[in-house]
Regions:
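Hydrophobic membrane-targeting signal helices
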Residues: 59, 79, 147-148, 222, ...
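N-terminal transmembrane-helix/juxtamembrane module of multi-pass inner/ER membrane proteins
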Residues: 2-49, 80-108, 236-248, 252-256, ...
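Tryptophan-centered motif/residue detector
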Residues: 58-60, 123, 286
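Membrane-embedded catalytic cores of phosphoryl/pyrophosphoryl-handling enzymes
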Residues: 53-55, 67, 77, 93-261
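Polybasic, low-complexity association/targeting segments
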Residues: 48-72
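Membrane helical hairpin/interfacial module
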Residues: 63-90
Length: 306
């Protein structure tokens, strides 16, 4: 893959020194309570948080919202490591005067920030669907807070979070256009235009952070087609059925995530890309069609007489 040395360009124009000083300024306000707060904020832009919210939308809340936000978020998550491996900007970790926290979330290169890009894709997707003032305020606030948290924790440059926010927003705008086109033409196969081009990256980006979300995206798309063709489940239900669906669905999700990792680990090395692709493919499939199929056939789905 062609690489663009952004760090040299930024240094040439004097931006790196400016960014170092800005990070030091942000970290001057540090104290233990803020450490906890910003670590909690950054968790809202991580895999577990988004999976649980996607599950709720798809199983209990609003399927169409879940599909739109899910597709945009996954496409954005796939694009992020491709951009990182193209620009190859190093993180501020190790810079004198900057203290880094939560280092296990700071894998790979810096630009653009994956947490900020994910938050921007998720919340922009919600804002484009739920067009209410309170949602705009919440969405913009969450994107800004996640961006600030990554700088406060010392794992990203300001340019990283700005680039991440821009990439996430642009992805949502493009995916909304594609979704609208697929709806007008009543042809859900048009969504393949968002999936197939990204398959090329499997041969260019040797990064599990690319393979995993691509597997989930592929499973999500196939499950979307199968659910619409064969199930068409209603997500509305009384509160206890909603709780039961979430419990059963999330347990199934954990089983797939952990069970397949153990099973595939007996066949492939733990870091083998194909095993990650397969595992996340079934996670995407479970979210969209697997869990709804179980809900319907185990009589925990919506009942008309309730």
């Amino acid at each position: 893959m062609r690489q663009f040395d952004i760090s040299r360009r930024l240094a040439y124009y004097g931006f790196m020194e400016l960014q170092v000083e800005l990070l030091k300024l942000i970290q001057q306000i540090r104290f233990p309570l803020l450490d906890v707060l910003f670590q909690a904020i950054t968790i809202t832009a991580e895999e577990l948080f988004f999976i649980v919210l996607a599950a709720w939308f798809l199983w209990c809340g609003n399927k169409q919202l879940g599909y739109r936000v899910g597709f945009a978020f996954l496409v954005s998550t796939v694009v992020n490591p491709m951009l990182k491996n193209s620009f190859r900007l190093e993180r501020p970790i190790g810079i004198e005067g900057i203290e880094a926290q939560r280092l296990h979330t700071a894998e790979g290169f810096a630009f653009p920030s994956g947490h900020t890009q994910g938050a921007a894709a998720f919340w922009t997707g919600l804002m484009s669907f739920v067009r209410r003032p309170w949602m705009y305020r919440l969405g913009v606030s969450m994107i800004a807070l996640v961006a600030l948290s990554r700088m406060y924790l010392g794992v990203h440059w300001p340019v990283d979070v700005l680039g991440g926010a821009a990439a996430g927003i642009v992805t949502v705008l493009l995916m909304n256009k594609l979704f609208d086109l697929a709806s007008r033409r009543k042809n859900k196969f048009l969504l393949l235009w968002a999936v197939l081009p990204l398959a090329v990256g499997l041969f260019l980006v040797e990064d599990k952070n690319y393979v995993q979300p691509f597997g989930a995206l592929l499973g999500f798309w196939l499950g979307y087609l199968l659910e619409d063709r064969y199930l068409k489940v209603e997500v509305a239900a009384v509160w206890w059925r909603q709780g039961l669906k979430m419990a059963v669905g999330l347990l199934g999700l954990i089983g797939i995530r952990v069970g397949l990792k153990l099973l595939l680990g007996t066949v492939f090395p733990s870091d083998f890309m194909i095993s990650n692709l397969i595992r996340y493919f079934f996670i995407g499939l479970w979210l969209t069609v697997g869990a709804p199929y179980v809900f319907r056939n185990c009589n925990i789905q919506y009942k008309k007489n309730e």
